[in-house]
Amino acid sequence: MGKKQLVLVGNGMAGVRAIEEILSVAKDEFQITIFGAEPHPNYNRILLSKVLQGDTDIKDITLNDWDWYEENNIQLYTNETVIKVDTENKTVITDADRIQPYDELILATGSVPFILPIPGADKKGVTAFRDIKDTDTMLAASKQYKKAAVIGGGLLGLEAARGLLNLGMDVSVIHLAPFLMERQLDATAGRLLQNELEKQGMTFLLEKQTEEIVGDDRVEGLRFKDGTSIEADLVVMAVGIRPNTTLGAESGIPVNRGIIVNDYMQTEIPHIYAVGECAEHRGIAYGLVAPLYEQAKVLAKHMCGIETKPYEGSVLSTQLKVSGVEVFSAGDFNESEEKKAIKVFDEQDGIYKKIVLRGNQIVGAVLFGDSSEGNRLFSMIQKEADISETSKISILQPLSQEAGTSITAAMSDDEIICGCNGVSKGAIIQAIQEKGCSSTDEIKACTGASRSCGGCKPLVEEILQHTLGSDFDASAQKEAICGCTTLSRDEVVEEIKAKGLSHTREVMNVLGWKTPEGCSKCRPALNYYLGMINPTKYEDDRTSRFVNERMHANIQKDGTYSVVPRMYGGVTNSTDLRKIADVVDKYEIPLVKMTGGQRIDLIGVKKEDLPKVWEDLDMPSGYAYGKTLRTVKTCVGEQFCRFGTQDSMALGIALEKKFEGLNTPHKVKMAVSACPRNCAESGIKDLGVVGIDGGWELYVGGNGGTHLRAGDLLMKVKTNEEVLEYAGAYLQYYRETANYLERTSAWLERVGLSHVQSVLNDPEKRQELNGRMNETLSVHKDPWKDFLEDKQTSKELFENVVTTS
């Protein structure tokens, strides 16, 4: 009997969490297919505000990367929307005319932002704040415009406003209520929050109702019902969300505010479940992650036939993610005749605490300025703890006063530390004592604590410190390369050298990896470190590379690939152009585009056509997919330009031919400009060369991406040979001392320009670095030609393996 077909509609946090729970209890029961409307793998939507605020990058909020889907034999269709469920024939139909049968179906369509139905809401410059696309829109706007208006002073609106402030914009927050976050805070806490955020630079317009968004093609401002107005170049709508029930309603699945489900997350149609923000349970649709994960656990067990307690609803807690502000609320914090409040207000230090009691039970809490007791109070609310024999005011006094410096020391083992993932203090202690976890990353890998919003990370570290005592290593909390080991990057590298290790599995076995198979974070890193240390003897582990590097092409959101052949220095000829044109016609490649690195990108190549395309092109790989040298961009130079002082094309071609295929911690881009006019943009490259009278200037650590950084002047040299010598030593030193996935810009800021200069100015060290560089380059093979010669591997990779699409 074959596996049952399980289809998940929605690639977000709730739906994929349900899949994770299913895999944990019945890994081989289902053949899983996932449809996601966005072009990305599953990511942590909660942390988009951190991306906007500049605290993290998009890549860092990915929860399950492309490799996770492949490793679990999951067929992922990104950028594809299910538009109909045929409940009679048990199939789903997508906007790409794909028909997918199912035995079990999970609807996790999430929610959609509420856009005010006012004139001008469709103008350019008006956006919601729900996904990566919205975040990119705001990041792009901040580079061109200066005045932002955020409509909505709730949790999401304030996090968006803080991010826009960090991006250098003037931010006004428009809110209909008389104080901020009125659904989570009382008036006192709301006004304290307003005062704090005003100090950070925000402007607030309270009790304002937006009547119109004004402007021609693009937004220019807001007009309010009271006749006043403000200027704005960007408007962010953060006034709420509503469950996305369109698919359910149009498919005959009963809906109300959300898709109606029972206590096991089943809809009224057999074999169809709903989970997350789209689901309505006992009249409530939840929008926070903790209840959605609780739902996912119940759904998974029920679908797999495992006895489980029903889902009976959730008590909610909220924590604002804005730097420098501590805000927490939980439960029912509004006072009434039946509910009385106890409040503590330290006006001098800006600390406000309030609990709401119904009889002898805490039913709600609000904390401002000091949220350290939030988890403890939330646990008491959830458990409906009887406090009849407790001094009421003592509940608001920090337990740390009675139990040393550790808040968590006084907590019971069943108290929840990570509300998002339902991880208790006892579960964390068990992971430390029984599984040997000794860092927050390892705790995250073992238990899931701090995996979502990250707010509980200080408490997790505190439990580690209290449990391990003198064995606790604070430095290890930040330096372990992943949760599979306690070893730092430097320790791993030293162990590989000392023990002569040559394969990723050997490293994990010998160095005592806690997860035998490793993870998608450590395996590519180990593979890189092994090749960097001993390039002539190590065994490349293709399975430890990211999917683009395994396929030697970039996967696109529709499952096709892009192919970029090498064009040294951005220079081509008629023969190569004819080859490219013939390949485009022969394989019906839908898009041909010039890249920013002066190359030609063939986009939309079918997976099975990749080897044939490479063979017909008969050109070297451009490594557009790898952690390696990408391009060397050049201007036309002194041969043709009236201002050029040097032959930039010749040097660019020499650099690219020397260093092509060089594995590096992250991608490396170079450029050579023939004069200080810098037409090749040498000043924002990892290594940039600028021609001057009588020689060259070398710039390093530049970045033209999200975190724009001008390169630093490394030195001046006179000849092309010196450029190649110093470039080789610089790149080798970067290879040997950078963390895997650390760009040269971040590495240079970490180690310091003066330190790098002192290393490269030492002739002996420079010679040694170039010697190791030349050894590495001596084993380089063009991967496309290598695959064409290795028929067996090519067949396995391009014909038999299930990949994400």
From Swiss-Prot:
What InterPro entries does its record include?
BFD-like_2Fe2S-bd_dom, BFD-like_2Fe2S-bd_dom_sf, FAD/NAD-bd_sf, FAD/NAD-binding_dom, FAD/NAD-linked_Rdtase_dimer_sf, NasD-like, NiRdtase/SiRdtase_haem-b_fer, Nit/Sulf_reduc_fer-like_dom_sf
Pathway assignment reads: Nitrogen metabolism; nitrate reduction (assimilation)
Q: Could you give the cofactor binding note from the entry?
A: Binds 1 siroheme per subunit.
- What up-regulates or down-regulates this gene? Positively regulated by TnrA under nitrogen-limited conditions. Induced by ArfM.
Residues engaged in binding siroheme: 679
Q: Mention any Pfam family matching this sequence.
A: Fer2_BFD
Q: Where does [2Fe-2S] cluster bind?
A: 418, 420, 453, 456
Q: Which reaction does it catalyse?
A: NH4(+) + 3 NADP(+) + 2 H2O = nitrite + 3 NADPH + 5 H(+); NH4(+) + 3 NAD(+) + 2 H2O = nitrite + 3 NADH + 5 H(+)
**UniProt KW keywords:** 2Fe-2S, 4Fe-4S, FAD, Flavoprotein, Heme, Iron, Iron-sulfur, Metal-binding, NADP, Nitrate assimilation, Oxidoreductase
Q: Where NADP(+) is bound, by residue? A: 193-223
Which residues participate in FAD binding?
43-79
**Gene Ontology BP term (one):** nitrate assimilation
Per its record, what are the GO molecular function terms? Answer: 2 iron, 2 sulfur cluster binding; 4 iron, 4 sulfur cluster binding; flavin adenine dinucleotide binding; heme binding; metal ion binding; NADP binding; nitrite reductase NADH activity
Please state what class of enzyme this protein is.
Answer: oxidoreductase
EC id: 1.7.1.4
Question: Where is [4Fe-4S] cluster annotated to bind?
Answer: 635, 641, 675, 679
TM helices/strands, residue ranges: none
Which cofactor(s) does the record list? siroheme; [2Fe-2S] cluster; [4Fe-4S] cluster; FAD
- Primary role: Required for nitrite assimilation.
| Subunit composition and interactions | Homodimer.
Query: What's the family?
Result: Belongs to the nitrite and sulfite reductase 4Fe-4S domain family.
Which protein, by its recorded name, is this?
Nitrite reductase [NAD(P)H]
Q: Which organism is it from?
A: Bacillus subtilis (strain 168)
Q: Quick one: which gene encodes this?
A: nasD
